[in-house]
C-alpha cells in the first residue's frame, strides 16, 4: 500500500475538543494515522502528554504559529536528527517547584540522552493571566512578554539553543472550581491551553525556531473521580518531559525550499474536528487543494463548519473512518465504490 503521502492532524488548543482537549489524549489518533502515511505533521497540543509521550519517527512536532506560516508557504520544514534544547524558566516559579523542573531536565539528559543547553531563569516574573471567551474557548495574556523574549534570545545566542522549552508559573484554580472539576472529569475546556499557545507563538514568531510550553503547577489533591482523559495531568509535578522529547526532534523552520524539506504543497490530507475549520493553516491548505477530512465526533466549543466557509470537505464520523479515507485514496479506490449504492453515470 502506498505510504508516501503527507497528512496534517489538527486539534486546535483551548476549544474543549472531546479528543485532543486533554494532555496527550490524541496521541493514539496520531499513532494510528502515522501508520498509513509517509509523514504526519501535527502540533504540541496533540503530542504533549505531560509525563507521557510516544516516539514516532515519521511524525513532525510543529508549533501552531509555525504551522500557519508553513501552510501559507512562507516556511518549510527541515527534518533533523536532534536539536539542542534550551530551558527557559519563569522567575515566578517557587524554588521547590523550580527544582522539580530542573530534575526533569537532568533526567531527560541521563535517561533519554537528550541534548540540553544550560538553563536560564527570566529576569522578571512572567505573570500569566487566564481568560475564557464567550464561545467557551480559553485564552490568556503574559504580563511581561519582553522578559520572555530576552530570555529566549540569551539561550539562542549564548547557549546555542536550537529549540526553546518554556516553563511558566500559572495561576492555580482552587480544587473546588467548577471549571477544574469539569476538566478533571473529562467534560470541560482546558483553562490553561489558550495562554500556553500565546507563549510559544511569541518565541516562534520572533526567532523562527521550535518552541513549546509546559505550565508549572502544584499537584492537585488526590481524587478517585478522575477521567482517564485527564489522568496524565495527575501523575506528577511537571508537564515538561513530553515537551523536551518533542522539541528534541522538532523540524527546523526554513524560508528557502530545499530538495529534502517539506512544503505546504506536499500536504495531501488535513484531518480536523468538523466544528473547528476556521484556523489559518486549514484555510491555507484547503485553498491549495489538500483533502480536508472533518471528524464529526470530535466535538468542540466552536461552531465553524467547513460548509459555512465554502470548504469542500469529506465528513466522517470518527478518526477510524478518517484513516479509511486516507487508505482508500492512497490506494486509488473511489470512496463511492465502498458504499452500498453507486450512482449511475450521466451523459454530459
Placement of each model-derived feature along the sequence:
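Short, hinge-like loop/turn segments at secondary-structure boundaries
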Residues: 58-61, 229-231, 311-312
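Generic multipass alpha-helical transmembrane bundles of integral membrane proteins
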Residues: 134-142, 151-152, 156, 164-167, ...
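A short acidic (Asp/Glu
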Residues: 21, 52-55, 175-179, 222-225, ...
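Hydrophobic beta-strand scaffold residues
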Residues: 40, 116, 210-211, 292
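Metallocofactor- and cofactor-centric catalytic cores in central/energy metabolism, strongly enriched
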Residues: 1-180, 189-193
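Anion (oxyanion) recognition and catalysis
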Residues: 34-35, 204-205, 286
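C-terminal functional extensions of proteins
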Residues: 218-222, 239-269, 273-348
Amino acid at each position: 500500500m502506498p505510504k508516501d503521502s503527507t497528512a496534517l492532524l489538527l486539534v486546535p488548543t483551548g476549544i474543549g475538543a472531546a479528543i485532543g482537549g486533554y494532555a496527550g489524549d490524541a496521541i493514539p489518533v496520531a499513532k494510528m494515522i502515522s501508520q498509513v502515511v509517509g509523514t504526519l505533521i501535527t502540533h504540541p497540543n496533540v503530542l504533549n502528554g505531560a509525563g507521557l509521550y510516544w516516539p514516532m519517527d515519521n511524525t513532525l512536532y510543529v508549533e501552531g504559529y509555525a504551522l500557519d506560516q508553513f501552510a501559507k508557504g512562507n516556511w518549510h520544514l527541515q527534518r533533523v536528527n536532534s536539536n539542542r534544547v534550551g530551558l527557559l524558566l519563569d522567575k515566578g516559579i517557587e524554588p521547590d517547584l523550580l527544582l522539580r523542573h530542573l530534575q526533569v531536565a537532568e533526567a531527560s539528559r541521563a535517561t533519554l540522552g537528550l541534548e540540553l543547553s544550560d538553563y536560564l531563569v527570566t529576569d522578571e516574573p512572567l505573570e500569566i493571566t487566564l481568560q475564557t471567551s464567550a464561545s467557551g474557548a480559553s485564552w490568556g495574556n503574559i504580563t511581561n512578554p519582553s522578559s520572555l523574549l530576552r530570555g529566549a534570545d540569551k539561550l539562542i545566542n549564548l547557549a546555542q539553543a536550537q529549540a526553546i522549552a518554556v516553563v511558566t508559573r500559572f495561576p492555580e484554580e482552587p480544587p473546588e472550581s467548577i471549571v477544574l472539576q469539569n476538566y478533571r472529569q473529562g467534560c470541560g475546556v482546558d483553562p490553561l491551553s489558550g495562554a500556553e499557545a500565546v507563549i510559544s507563538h511569541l518565541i516562534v514568531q520572533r526567532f523562527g525556531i521550535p518552541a513549546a510550553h509546559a505550565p508549572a503547577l502544584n499537584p492537585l489533591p488526590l481524587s478517585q473521580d478522575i477521567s482517564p482523559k485527564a489522568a496524565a495531568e495527575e501523575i506528577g509535578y511537571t508537564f515538561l518531559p513530553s515537551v523536551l522529547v518533542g522539541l528534541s526532534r522538532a523540524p527546523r523552520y526554513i524560508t528557502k525550499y530545499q530538495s529534502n524539506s517539506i512544503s505546504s504543497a506536499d500536504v495531501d490530507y488535513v484531518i480536523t474536528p468538523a466544528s473547528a475549520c476556521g484556523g489559518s493553516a486549514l484555510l491555507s491548505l484547503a485553498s491549495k487543494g489538500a483533502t480536508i477530512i472533518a471528524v464529526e465526533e470530535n466535538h468542540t466549543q466552536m461552531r465553524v463548519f467547513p460548509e459555512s466557509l465554502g470548504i469542500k470537505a469529506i465528513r466522517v464520523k470518527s478518526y477510524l473512518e478518517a484513516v479509511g479515507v486516507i487508505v482508500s485514496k492512497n490506494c486509488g479506490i473511489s470512496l463511492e465504490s465502498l458504499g452500498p449504492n453507486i450512482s449511475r453515470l450521466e451523459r454530459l
